[in-house]
A protein has these predicted regions:
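Hydrophobic alpha-helical transmembrane segments in multi-pass membrane proteins
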Residues: 39-60, 170, 228-380
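Membrane-helix interface and helix-disruption motif detector
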Residues: 5, 22-34, 325, 350, ...
């Protein structure tokens, strides 16, 4: 792989940057992005030999076809909607109970739905709160399209669900049956396993410890976190509950150290990290930041580091997660990783860490302002302090408590 990267016509970071403009030109139908892509192509042919630039153009054509195909598929899916649904398979880790309101994501005939239901009794509420295995619901309900953007600059719920592969919502009127089922689908089984971990934490740990534990270990923040969510949002540090490279690094390094102590060789360990990464990604709900970080870790195992590592990660994400850069989480995750790659230097001590933290916080500011239109100045200092507290103290302690429980 390293030899292929060295022999490539242009630096990989140039290629990923070029494809990013093409990506937004197609998925967002942006004339500005298309103009930027054409301008970069002209610069490419000016700066590099025509033979090298021609190879890059062919690669752009292949990725462009892939982007157009994915965009067409999504367009077709949004037009060919289901007329009715009688049975839905529940994805357990998406279950949320808020008062007498139940919501979850479900599958039926290869389609995904966001499902809502008004609970009829306290017994029914407790049953869904404790539900961990895969179940299929027989129901009578009404399908509808999600709400779009209500006002200028407001949250577009329809666009968000589209990035998750969901084009319709289902409001259940009556539940006719609830049947436990089995499945060979890895994603569904990991969803069930994650739900079991969440329910275990909720039933064995007090509040607010359980919120910290589910948030930092599993990337799951439930409805009972809302009051704390408002507090952390006002302080500008709610993003610390989003799983990041620090958590991924902690668990990956812990997994490697454990297996090395058991006597495994580095070569065998390298290949065992692949199934571990899949399981860990599933236990965190296939979070955008976790998948990005895991890809970078796996590529680093094969000697791909620095900007080449970041660029190759972006190329892989274009293929395996075409909607990655259409979400705020995906963009912010890659922006953090890019700034960290560009600014990380050999240095030790508090001064180096403080400097790096300040650069990252200021570097990400334009993107945070674009997506959320707000910024708390003191969040830079609080992020620096609390990131150490969360990742170096809370994360190890909560992990130990969870394992011992």
């Amino acid at each position: 792989m390293l030899q292929w990267i060295k022999n490539f016509s242009i630096p990989l970071i140039y290629l990923s940057f070029l494809l990013l403009w093409l990506y937004y030109a197609i998925f967002s139908a942006s004339y500005l992005a298309l103009l930027g892509f054409v301008f970069l192509l002209v610069c490419l042919f000016i700066q590099f030999p025509w033979k090298s630039a021609g190879k890059v153009l062919i690669i752009c054509g292949i990725f462009g076809f892939w982007f157009v195909f994915q965009n067409w598929q999504q367009s077709q899916a949004s037009q060919n909607l289901a007329d009715s649904v009688e049975r839905v398979r529940i994805l357990p880790d998406t279950i949320k109970v808020n008062g007498d309101s139940l919501s979850f994501r479900g599958k039926s005939n290869g389609r995904a739905f966001q499902v809502y239901y008004k609970l009829q009794s306290e017994e029914e509420k407790e049953a869904f709160q404790a539900l961990t295995d895969l179940h299929e619901i027989g129901l009578e309900g009404k399908l509808s399209e999600p709400e779009g953007q209500r006002n200028f600059g407001g949250f577009n719920y329809q666009a968000y669900l589209k990035t998750q592969g969901i084009y319709q919502t289902l409001n259940i009127k009556t539940i006719q049956s609830l049947q436990k089922i089995g499945s060979w689908d890895i994603g569904e089984n990991l969803s069930s396993l994650r739900r079991k971990a969440v329910v275990w934490i909720k039933t064995h740990f007090p509040d607010p410890m359980r919120n910290y534990m589910t948030g930092l270990l599993l990337g799951h923040l439930d409805t009972d976190f809302e009051e704390m969510n408002e507090l952390y949002s006002s302080l500008g540090i709610i993003h610390l509950f989003a799983l990041s490279g620090m958590q991924v690094g902690f668990f990956m390094n812990g997994f490697k150290k454990l297996l090395l102590r058991l006597g495994l060789t580095q070569e065998k360990l390298k290949w065992l990290t692949y199934p571990f990464s899949l399981i860990y990604a599933g236990l965190t709900g296939f979070s955008a930041s976790v998948i990005r970080s895991l890809l970078q870790k796996l590529l680093a195992q094969h000697g791909v580091k620095g900007l080449d590592n970041f660029a190759l990660t972006v190329l892989v994400l274009f293929i395996v997660m075409p909607n990655f850069f259409l979400t705020a989480g995906g963009v912010l995750s890659c922006a953090y990783a890019f700034i960290l790659t560009m600014t990380s230097k050999e240095g030790e001590g508090l001064k180096a860490v403080t400097s790096e933290s300040l650069v990252i916080s200021l570097g990400i500011l334009p993107i945070l302002s674009f997506y959320f239109a707000e910024f708390q100045p003191w969040s830079i200092l609080l992020t620096f302090v609390f990131s150490f507290l969360f990742d170096l103290t809370f994360l190890p302690l909560l992990s130990i408590l969870f394992v011992l429980s």
